[in-house]
Design a protein with these regions (language model features):
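Short alpha-helix in the alpha/beta-hydrolase fold that links the catalytic acid
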Residues: 203, 328, 342-352
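Catalytic-loop region of hydrolases
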Residues: 31-100, 354
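Short beta-strand/loop motif that positions the catalytic acidic residue
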Residues: 332-338
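Accessory cap/linker subdomain of secreted extracellular hydrolases
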Residues: 222-322
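Alpha/beta-hydrolase active-site loop
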Residues: 159-180
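C-terminal catalytic histidine-bearing segment of alpha/beta-hydrolase fold enzymes
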Residues: 304, 308, 313-314, 331, ...
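Short, surface-exposed "cap/lid" segments of acyl-processing enzymes
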Residues: 80-87, 91-135
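Primarily recognizes the serine-hydrolase "nucleophile elbow" in alpha/beta-hydrolase
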Residues: 174-242
Length: 398
């Protein structure tokens, strides 16, 4: 097992403290999350400038393998072209960069929340959350890790809005090229889990047109959110599914103006709003969310299935992952015990890619649930990514 299995130990320790902390949580309230500071605030003049250019950066300690980490604020765009600022992390390997610069791997993170204070760059366990990061850095790859729009920077966060995520991912790679040893690095791979799997696939879909100066060598995704309508429908009767549906509806009501009141029962609105304010960093956060979302088991939606109701039906289709240009190889990993992103949905997406002419490596993970799909596939993903940078023929399971 690769060293990112550290997060398993972190999660186990956090879970062991649940009994100790649970009374304090309900007497005193949840422990306060990190808050944004002036680093994340921008003016109109700050945002003006080329996409992917740096607004500011500051050092961040704690990266593995002697690497140098920077918290960054960079310029990007909304899907409609509106300029925005996005935050994230850039990690540069230790040592002298090779000729041509360090190759770059963009890390696309899984769900952390939908409000600004849920940005991974604010997280305590930031580096442990990046599946495969130690091996990537030891192997001589720089990492560009976006927070996504509206996390860190002012919200709302466009949760599961694929093109928004992808633009932020690509512009994080552009921002990384501002650092020594990366100026001439135009090749990158993207690797993500869950929400980040969706971001990775959308990155593959738009990279050629959005960033023609960059060369995307491969797309790797673990338990990606692909067919959003099917995933929402499959998960409505599970605790995790209700949580993610609530987050999606809350976010899209603000991003798209899709009425929350038309699909959520009046008695559930306060619970949905409360869940939106909670971040997900570790096992304890999941425990708190489970307790907070308990009322939704009795009263949640005012419609049978939001996926069949406009505008949600159209929005879910718009943000479903499509096929990629056939020349971009794809790595997919899927936990067979995943009850949030069902294996059949990922398998169906693989078949779509195959029919479109893509080269796809599919890794099935026995006895692996959703939360660990990224960590348990990270070694295989890093090896696969290394092969793409080395120019070796991509394995094909189609």
């Amino acid at each position: 097992m690769e060293r990112e299995g550290e997060l398993r130990l972190v999660a186990m320790k956090l879970w062991a403290y649940v009994v100790f902390f649970v009374n304090a949580v309900y007497v005193l309230g949840p422990l306060p999350a990190a808050s944004q500071n002036a680093f994340y605030r921008t003016s109109e003049s700050d945002i003006a400038g080329p996409v992917g250019s740096l607004i500011r950066e500051e050092p961040r300690s704690g990266a593995a393998a002697g690497a140098i980490a920077h918290k960054v604020l960079y310029r990007s765009t909304k899907p409609d072209g509106t300029p925005i600022a996005v935050s994230g992390i850039v990690i540069v390997p230790a040592g002298q960069a090779p000729a041509g610069g360090w190759p770059i791997v963009a890390w696309a993170h899984p769900t952390t929340g939908v409000v600004p204070r849920c940005a991974p760059s604010l997280a305590i366990f930031l580096f442990q959350q990046m599946a495969g990061s130690r091996r990537l850095l030891e192997g001589g790859y720089a990492i560009a890790a976006t927070d996504y729009p509206g996390l860190g920077t002012p919200g709302p966060h466009p949760y599961l809005v694929g093109e928004s995520e992808a633009r932020a991912v690509i512009d994080s790679v552009r921002a990384a090229r501002s650092f020594p040893g990366l100026e001439n690095s135009n090749r990158f791979a993207v690797w993500g889990h869950s929400q980040g799997g969706q971001a990775s696939l959308f990155t593959g879909m738009i990279a050629k047109t959005y960033a023609p100066e960059l060369q995307l060598v491969g797309v790797a995704a673990a338990a990606p959110a692909t067919d959003l309508a099917t995933l929402m429908t499959d998960d409505l009767n599970t605790m995790g599914g209700r949580n993610l549906t609530a987050m999606t509806i809350w976010s899209w009501s603000r991003v798209y103006g899709a009425s929350m009141e038309e699909v959520v029962a009046p008695a559930a609105i306060s619970t949905v709003n409360a869940l939106a304010e909670q971040c997900i960093e570790g096992a304890f956060d999941i425990y708190v969310r489970e307790k907070m979302s308990a009322p939704l088991e009795k009263t949640f939606l005012s419609v049978k299935n939001p996926a069949t109701v406009e505008p949600y039906r159209t929005l879910l289709e718009r943000n479903a992952a499509g096929v990629l240009p056939a020349e971009i190889p794809v790595f997919l990993a899927q936990g067979l015990k995943d009850e949030l992103v069902r294996p059949a949905v990922t398998q169906a997406y693989m078949q779509r890619l195959c029919k479109a002419g893509s080269t796809v490596k599919m890794l099935d993970l026995s006895n692996v649930s959703h939360g660990f799909a990224g960590y348990d596939s990270a070694d295989a993903a890093v090896d696969w990514i290394a092969g793409r940078f080395a120019g070796r023929a991509a394995p094909n399971d189609c």
